[in-house]
UniProtKB/Swiss-Prot annotation:
It comes from the Bacteria. HAMAP family: RraA. The gene is rraA. This is Regulator of ribonuclease activity A. It comes from Tolumonas auensis (strain DSM 9187 / NBRC 110442 / TA 4). One of its GO terms (molecular function) is enzyme binding. It is found in: Cytoplasm.
Length: 161
């Protein structure tokens, strides 16, 4: 499904939070949206690898990586697992790597930057908790919508018809 965050903001301006502009698009899908699943981890992606093995149909993985630009939390392998399991997209407050491979995958991916250094593979981190960055608090079960213009958050699903 295609999402236009500008139109959604025009229609639902009093109902959405707008995330501060900071993300670049890396995945093969330029717009995506769904129910938020949160992860908080720092320079380690084992917990991410575990979560993307779950069914992601209708879900967006939102990762608070502490804004780290030193190690990539998302690589082609993790993103491919997520795409294979139906995840709509990944928003990473952190870095990605293997950018050319990410662009070939049928999943939306937004992150702060790319770097060739991979993250540690330990399972350090937590999931399904409130996280805060970009001037917004993200709660599990919120609904998030992203495109090349920006990222918006709503406590309820938005009617895009």
């Amino acid at each position: 499904m295609e999402y236009n965050t500008s139109q959604l903001c025009d229609i639902y301006q009093d109902q959405v939070d707008v995330v501060e502009p900071m993300f670049s698009t890396f995945g093969g899908r330029s717009s995506f949206g769904g129910l938020v699943t949160t992860i908080k981890c720092f320079e380690a992606n084992g917990i991410i690898r575990q979560i993307v093995k779950e069914s992601g149909v209708g879900r967006v993985l939102l990762i608070d990586g502490g804004g780290s630009l030193r190690r990539a939390l998302i690589d082609a392998d993790i993103a491919a697992i997520a795409a294979d399991n139906g995840w709509e997209g990944i928003i990473c407050y952190g870095s990605v790597r293997e950018v050319d491979a990410l662009a070939d995958l049928e999943i939306g991916i937004q992150a702060l930057a790319s770097i060739p250094v991979g993250a540690d593979e330990d399972d350090t981190g937590d999931s399904e908790l409130p996280v805060n960055f970009g001037g917004v608090t993200f709660l599990p079960e919120d609904h998030i919508y992203a495109d090349t213009t920006g990222v918006i958050l709503s406590p309820e699903p938005l009617d895009i018809e």
